[in-house]
């Protein structure tokens, strides 16, 4: 039984979907004014891993993640680059799709864009105004936060404390326009030549919070299973989404709230962010390292915990990934001539590890415990691959189970095709030299292969080879 830590209740709760064997998920997507950085990728990969585990457990997942393609950052960036906001959005949505594909993120069921849902946003705001939850001031529209009795419930904050904080962070001009300092914008009146749309209360554009309320309920329904995002979105973004959505529908918005931890950098574990200038983009990093290494680092840490991004953590991820890949390759190699009987003990151990994996991941998607089980499975198949007699059917069963568990973390385990005839010939020459006890020639050929980036592994069944970093 899957248990989820619900930010709303601050407890682990047994997951009970609205519809049996189906999961509806909404995860806040990027504002597409630049390349995503590794901190953004943490959330994307964390929720992709959660989605993959639901699928591993037999659930059908409808996964919606939006693109914020109009806001202040979009407008400012487009102006700086001398292009339109839609052109900027198209550019970085394309870049986003390339980046997430590189780190093996499954495509969302839907990636709605805010600008494609303007009519729905206007209708949503009008409904809130009709219900008395929103008011217009000179073309702007604000939400009456105090009218929503549960405001602050998600972030566990008192509304009076929120009022005090709001009064310290809002400029005097905007404060004067609002009925209450904690009220927030649903619609912003157009300024100059900014991109804008016509609405009954004036030409302008939507606020950030209303976009997610509209797109999540439009594509998943008034109530859906899971809403996710980074922990920095709890307040005000997710708090405001709840206030908007539940005021409009009169129903519970999301049933489970999930928030991932930050990526930190430096000795003081500072949060990685564009505003602090301490970020590394996925676009740049995947050109320097195997993207699977970044995926491994991000997906094998429990999603609520922070990840410290260092060269050492990347190297550890690289080493562990190679161990898992090599275990797969070694066992796959034994398929040739595998005619022995199946090993009942190995089958029992494999079945137990599959059970252990489910136990680990059912506990709030505990990836650290889950990947530990995958390491244990790798050790099991390494031992089995060294047996004198192995069984082909059992090898395939082990490889299938192993690959399915690894795939939950977005790790692709597969046989690497070594079809280089020149290398094959050099390996054969070395094997013959070893058989002839011509160690000088054997060592010379090993060094030659090493210079070619080839790693050799001598086994009782023969010499296996692979190219470095594959």
UniProtKB/Swiss-Prot annotation:
High-level lineage: Bacteria, Bacillati, Bacillota, Bacilli, Lactobacillales
Catalytic reaction(s) noted: tRNA(Cys) + L-cysteine + ATP = L-cysteinyl-tRNA(Cys) + AMP + diphosphate
Pfam hit, one: CysS_C
Name of the protein this chain belongs to: Cysteine--tRNA ligase
Binding site for Zn(2+): 28, 212, 237, 241
Keyword terms: Aminoacyl-tRNA synthetase, ATP-binding, Cytoplasm, Ligase, Metal-binding, Nucleotide-binding, Protein biosynthesis, Zinc
Subcellular location field: Cytoplasm
Gene name of the record: cysS
Bound cofactor: record note: Binds 1 zinc ion per subunit.
This protein's record includes keyword Aminoacyl-tRNA synthetase: yes
Cofactor(s) this protein requires: Zn(2+)
Motif window: 'HIGH' region: 30-40
Organism: Pediococcus pentosaceus (strain ATCC 25745 / CCUG 21536 / LMG 10740 / 183-1w)
Assembly and binders: Monomer.
Database matches in SUPFAM superfamilies: Anticodon-binding domain of a subclass of class I aminoacyl-tRNA synthetases, Nucleotidylyl transferase
UniProt GO cellular component terms: cytosol
EC numbers for this chain: 6.1.1.16
């Amino acid at each position: 039984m899957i248990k989820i830590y619900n930010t709303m209740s601050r407890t682990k709760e047994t997951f009970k979907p609205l519809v049996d064997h189906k999961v509806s998920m909404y995860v806040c997507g990027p504002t597409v004014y630049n390349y995503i950085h590794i901190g953004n990728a943490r959330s994307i990969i964390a929720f992709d891993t959660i989605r993959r585990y639901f699928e591993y457990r037999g659930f059908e997942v409808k996964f919606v993640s939006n693109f914020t393609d109009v806001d202040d950052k979009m407008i400012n960036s487009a102006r700086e680059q001398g292009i339109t906001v839609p052109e900027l959005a198209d550019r970085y949505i394309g870049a986003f799709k390339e980046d997430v594909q590189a780190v093996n993120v499954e495509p969302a069921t839907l990636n709605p864009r805010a600008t494609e849902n303007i009519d729905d946003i206007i209708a949503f705001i009008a409904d809130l105004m009709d219900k008395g939850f929103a008011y217009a001031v000179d073309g702007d529209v604000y939400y009456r936060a105090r009218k929503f009795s549960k405001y602050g419930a998600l972030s566990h904050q008192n509304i009076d404390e929120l009022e005090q904080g709001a009064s310290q962070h809002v400029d005097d001009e905007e404060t004067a326009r609002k009925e209450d300092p904690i009220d927030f914008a649903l619609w912003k009146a157009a300024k100059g030549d900014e991109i804008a749309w016509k609405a009954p209360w004036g030409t302008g554009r939507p606020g950030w919070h209303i976009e997610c309320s509209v797109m999540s309920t439009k594509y998943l329904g008034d109530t859906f299973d899971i809403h996710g995002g980074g922990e920095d979105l709890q307040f005000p973004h997710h708090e405001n989404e709840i206030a908007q959505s539940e005021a409009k529908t009169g129903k519970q918005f999301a049933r489970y709230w999930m928030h991932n931890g930050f990526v930190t950098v430096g000795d003081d574990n500072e949060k990685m962010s564009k505003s602090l200038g301490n970020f590394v983009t996925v676009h740049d990093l995947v050109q320097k390292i195997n993207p699977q290494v970044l995926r491994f680092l991000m997906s094998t840490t429990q999603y609520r915990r922070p990840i410290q991004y260092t060269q050492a953590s990347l190297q550890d991820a690289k080493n562990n990934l190679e161990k898992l890949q090599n275990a797969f390759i070694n066992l796959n190699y034994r398929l040739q001539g595998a005619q022995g009987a199946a090993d009942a003990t190995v089958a029992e151990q494999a079945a137990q590890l599959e059970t252990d994996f489910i136990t680990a991941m059912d506990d709030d998607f505990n990836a650290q415990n889950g990947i530990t089980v995958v390491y244990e499975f790798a050790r099991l198949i390494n031992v089995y691959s060294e047996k004198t007699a192995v069984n082909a059917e059992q090898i395939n069963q082990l490889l299938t189970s192993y690959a399915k568990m690894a795939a939950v973390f977005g790790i692709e385990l597969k046989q690497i095709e070594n079809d280089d005839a020149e290398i094959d010939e050099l390996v054969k020459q070395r094997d013959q030299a070893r058989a002839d006890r011509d160690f000088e020639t054997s060592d010379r050929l090993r060094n030659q292969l090493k210079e070619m980036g080839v790693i050799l592994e001598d086994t009782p069944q023969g010499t296996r080879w692979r190219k470095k970093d594959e």
